[in-house]
Amino acid sequence: MLNKLFGRVVSGKGEGKHYMSLPPYKEKFKNILGFEPYEGTLNVKLGYIINLNELNPIEVDDFYYKNNKYYGVKLIPVRICIKDYCVNGAIVYPKKTEHPNNVIELIAPIKLRKYLSLKNNYMVKIRL
C-alpha cells in the first residue's frame, strides 16, 4: 500500500484562502482533523497522477452558507515533511476543482510556506 507521496511546491490562485476562511469548512475540518486549519492551502505538484479515492478519504458534504452553495471535499490526514521536520495536516480534495490531477492541496494548522521555509519548486514528502 502507498504510504508516502513526493511533490514540488507550486503557486496557486489564492482561492484556498477564501474557502479556508469560511466558518462551516473550518468547523467541519476541526471536528474531523482535530485542528483549525490556517486560512490557505499549499499546492504541491506530484510527478505522477494518483487516485486519491483509493486512499480512504473522509468525505465532507456540500452545504449552504449565506445563501451560497459550497461543494463538499474529501480529506486525507497526512504528515507534511521537509527534511526531518514534519507537521500534521491533510490533503484537501475538493469535489469541484480547476487543478490538474497531479496537483494536490494541503492544509495544516500553520502557514506551511512560512514555518517550513518553503518556496516554489521545493520538494516535500507527504506521509499517509
From Swiss-Prot:
Keyword field: Flavoprotein, FMN, Kinase, Magnesium, Metal-binding, Nucleotide-binding, Transferase
Q: Which cofactor does it need?
A: Mg(2+)
Q: Does the keyword Glycosyltransferase apply?
A: no
The entry marks the following residues as binding CDP, namely: 12-17, 110-113
> Where does the source fall among the domains of life?
Archaea
Which top class of enzyme applies to this chain?
transferase
Matches recorded under Pfam families: CTP-dep_RFKase
Associated pathway: Cofactor biosynthesis; FMN biosynthesis; FMN from riboflavin (CTP route): step 1/1
Q: Which EC numbers characterise this protein's activity in its record?
A: 2.7.1.161
What catalytic reaction does the record list?
riboflavin + CTP = CDP + FMN + H(+)
Q: Does the keyword Metal-binding apply?
A: yes
Positions contributing to FMN binding: 97, 105
The UniProt note on the cofactor reads as follows: Binds 1 Mg(2+) ion per subunit.
Q: Which GO terms describe its biological process?
A: FMN biosynthetic process; riboflavin biosynthetic process
Q: Which GO terms describe its molecular function?
A: magnesium ion binding; nucleotide binding; riboflavin kinase activity
Binding of Mg(2+) occurs at 41, 43
SUPFAM superfamilies in UniProt:
Riboflavin kinase-like
Report the protein's function.
Catalyzes the CTP-dependent phosphorylation of riboflavin (vitamin B2) to form flavin mononucleotide (FMN).
- Database matches in PANTHER family: RIBOFLAVIN KINASE (PTHR40706:SF1)
NCBIfam families referenced in this protein's UniProt entry, alphabetically = ribK_Meth
Its family remark reads: Belongs to the archaeal riboflavin kinase family.
HAMAP family hit by this protein? Riboflavin_kinase
Can you say what this protein is called?
Riboflavin kinase
Organism of origin: Methanococcus aeolicus (strain ATCC BAA-1280 / DSM 17508 / OCM 812 / Nankai-3)
The taxonomy runs: Archaea, Methanobacteriati, Methanobacteriota, Methanomada group, Methanococci
